[in-house]
Amino acid sequence: MAKVQYFGTGRRKKSIARVRLVPGEGKITINKRSIEEYFGLETLRVIVNQPLVLTSTNGKFDVLVNVHGGGFTGQAGAIRHGISRALLKADENLRLELKKAGFLTRDPRMKERKKYGLKKARRAPQFSKR
């Protein structure tokens, strides 16, 4: 018998997360490590769990994630986006509450490029009057 699983891809900044939802008891595995082991900060764990808590599905699915690129915050956002998309494939009725919370929207904010003549994207070199 084929195993029921739902896939979702999430992106945020430079991070890309491939998420797989499998019916289970609510374990979250990121790059073959537990969520507690992967994300040291509690706030990042909360971000990842948001779609599951919102839709009351946090004990129904095991979440298997493969994520690469970017930093911790970007990865947490990408995982949240991927979980939301996978939940949508599992149950289309969740669209309204996920959309209302903004979890289905790809955050378009990216790092601004550095310009020549400046130290960073907007930081100008120190000005000296004399």
Curated annotation (Swiss-Prot):
Please list where the region (Disordered) is annotated: 109-130
What keywords does the record list, in alphabetical order?
Ribonucleoprotein, Ribosomal protein
| Keyword presence, 4Fe-4S | no
May I ask which residue range the UniProt record assigns to the signal sequence? none
* Composition bias type Basic residues, residue spans: 111-130
> One GO BP annotation here?
translation
Database matches in Pfam families: Ribosomal_S9
GO-annotated cellular components? cytosolic small ribosomal subunit
What HAMAP family is this protein classified in?
Answer: Ribosomal_uS9_B
Q: Which family does it belong to?
A: Belongs to the universal ribosomal protein uS9 family.
Under which name does UniProt file this protein? Small ribosomal subunit protein uS9
